[in-house]
Amino acid sequence: MRRNCHFVNEKARARSLYISLVRSLFESCSIIWRPTNQTLTAKLERIQKQAIKWILKEENISYSSCEVYVQKCKDINLLPLSARFDLNDLLFLHKVIYELKPVNLPFYLSFFNGQSRLRSCHLDNLSLVSSIHPKSTHCTTRTSNPLANTFFYRTYSKWNSLPISLREIKCPVHFKFMLKKHLWKSLVMPDAESSFLIDDDE
């Protein structure tokens, strides 16, 4: 992009080019192939860092600090790729749960039925529970177990962590809008939620 689109000076136009030409490649079927470890995620995140530097004309400025990078993402309303992958995962799971996709939950996931052996259980009727768990050995950890990295298994706990007021939203458009706000709020200061706009069409 830096070589072929060097003539683009407007931030909004440069941002649109990045979204349509680069980020769209990362988002194609990301619920299937998304990286599940920090090393691979960081490699993809570096591509977006370079793109943001190009958009903001700050190619000589370091974004090595996580706080700086998140702030730059916020300045041009681009979620960090790791959060964007979570967004896509949760949007798809939401459509499965509310039967907006012709896909069923796997056999090992079901909704919490109110019975728990734990005294302090924070699950509700929209929480998902798994009947199986990846086995951990000295050679296999939760993060390296194939089941732990599959879409439904890695996503159901993220779904449970969302506020129930968010999970109760059935409209996919409204859910996406509110989920973006929630993800931004988790990335920046709690009182910064309303200090920037979230495009509803991305």
Label each region the model flagged.
Residues 1-202:
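Hydrophobic/basic alpha-helical segments
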